[in-house]
């Protein structure tokens, strides 16, 4: 990469990454989910993922989670990766402790560390398999002690609602059972606003396409906490 290419990358704005037309489209989709709930999520999943679902099919059932399988090689790699991420996050957690000082008689200031009450994890799917994202997001939440962890993952495109088994295996390993199959931006809206099936969460995290990024940016306007706009690899590959 030459100096001119690097200069272009460093000067990219939100308009370059997420065009205004796409943000407008995503904003309309979010409003639809806010107003119509499950029906809008199902419509978006049918329109953008080619998968027709009923509202009662949005949540992945316990039998589907239990029956998910990957090859022995992949399974062993996931176990190893989860162990590494868990050990790192446990070390970080153990280094964090509450503290306070008395700045004047009767007045104390300090910090207290506690998990948020709920977290929504968006795991990309569709054309590729991203179990790595599932454990990179899920392990910190589990180690932190977040009481409720909800996962949204798009179903395999043009199928009958199947979800990447690698993601389900990771969730099973982590004890995460609240998993929803839904279009990315619509699923993020559902996690933020809540629907008839999906309860809202306090924070939404997870990487994705420009449409997913736009959804997270737009949700911040409704007071929903989301992750940073883009990870470095997303900025390069978009």
Briefly describe each language-model feature range.
Residues 149, 155-172, 181-193, 203:
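Alpha-helical recognition segments enriched in aromatics with Gly/Pro capping
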Residues 99-169:
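Conserved small-residue-rich beta-alpha loop and adjacent elements
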């Amino acid at each position: 990469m030459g100096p001119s290419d690097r200069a272009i990358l460093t000067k990219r704005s939100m308009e370059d990454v997420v065009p205004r037309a796409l943000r407008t489209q995503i904003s309309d989709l979010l409003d639809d989910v806010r107003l119509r709930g499950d029906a809008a999520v199902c419509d978006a999943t049918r329109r953008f993922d080619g998968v027709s679902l009923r509202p009662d099919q949005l949540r992945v059932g316990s039998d589907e989670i239990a029956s998910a399988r990957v090859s022995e090689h992949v399974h062993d790699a996931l176990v190893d990766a989860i162990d590494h991420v868990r050990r790192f996050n446990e070390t970080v957690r153990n280094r964090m402790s509450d503290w306070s000082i008395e700045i004047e008689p009767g007045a104390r200031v300090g910090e207290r560390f506690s998990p948020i009450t709920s977290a929504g994890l968006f795991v990309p799917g569709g054309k590729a398999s991203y179990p790595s994202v599932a454990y990179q997001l899920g392990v910190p939440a589990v180690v932190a002690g977040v009481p409720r962890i909800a996962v949204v993952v798009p179903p395999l495109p043009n199928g009958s609602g199947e979800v990447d088994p690698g993601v389900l295996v990771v969730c099973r390993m982590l004890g995460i059972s609240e998993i929803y199959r839904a279009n990315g931006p619509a699923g993020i809206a559902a996690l933020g606003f809540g629907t008839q099936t999906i309860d809202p969460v306090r924070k939404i995290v997870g990487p994705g396409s420009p449409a997913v990024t736009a959804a997270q940016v737009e949700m911040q306007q409704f007071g929903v906490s989301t992750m940073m706009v883009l990870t470095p690899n997303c900025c390069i590959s978009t």
